[in-house]
Amino acid sequence: MTDGFIAVIPARYASTRLPGKPLKDIAGKPMIQWVYDQTVQSGAAEVIVATDDERIAAACRDFGAPVEMTSAEHASGTDRIAELAHRFGWDDQQIVVNVQGDEPLISPLCIAQSARLLGWHPEATIATLTSPLTDEAEFRDPNFAKVVTDKNGWALYFSRAPIPWPRDGGMPMVRRHIGLYAYRAGGLKAISAAPPCALEEAEKLEQLRALWLGFRIIVANAVEPPSPAVDTEQDLAKVRSYLERARRPAR
């Protein structure tokens, strides 16, 4: 069942590169409100913002978003969501989507797709999405995580390295990983409770912990292109510029 999936938006104030990121103004609304509004359109039965900062919580209350305070000690959004899974006693089969709080233009269709994908694969603990990666510079860029799957879409490995490596040259068929995850709550709690593994610490990709623990991750191509994440002032300026252009009346 995915009709009742829950979407959680982890949001923290203390971003290293862009402090206060969730509250940055974009076309008259804080970024977290853009993410919330997009997520509501996904059809989730419930949308919750999970934060450790009262300033973010107050902003969410102002625009009517349900918000839960969580520990400031969490190392990741996954851990923040796992705290809610324990707090609310979510059933182990409950599907929970982790929506990145720094993607104000995130696709509602992709959020729903990730939940639906997990629902279709009862043997999976996580579902996630990809998009084709055709630019060679991005293929070599460690900021773009890549994923290799088997013929049925099961993840074999995620890496910041260029995989699969074209030994004979050329550009292989590469899939860029999109950081949108649907979890079963039981697996989410188990993954969060486990210590980081060596692969995760080397690559700084937390999904590798799930693979290392033996959980299965199903992967599919996203129905829409990935939305830009806001990590820096430059990213923020690009999103603001895009929305300003999009809101201008056609001539």
Locations of the language-model features?
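N-terminal glycine-rich phosphate-binding loop and ensuing alpha1 helix
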Residues: 2-51
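Conserved core of the sugar-phosphate nucleotidyltransferase
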Residues: 107-197
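A conserved hydrophobic position in a structured secondary element of the catalytic/binding core
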Residues: 51-52, 106, 183, 231
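Conserved alpha/beta core of the MobA/IspD/sugar-nucleotide pyrophosphorylase nucleotidyltransferase superfamily
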Residues: 172-251
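Hydrophobic/aromatic residues located in beta-strands of well-ordered beta-sheets
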Residues: 7, 47-49, 96, 127, ...
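Short, high-confidence coil segments that cap the C-terminus of an alpha-helix
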Residues: 44, 92-93, 121-124, 215
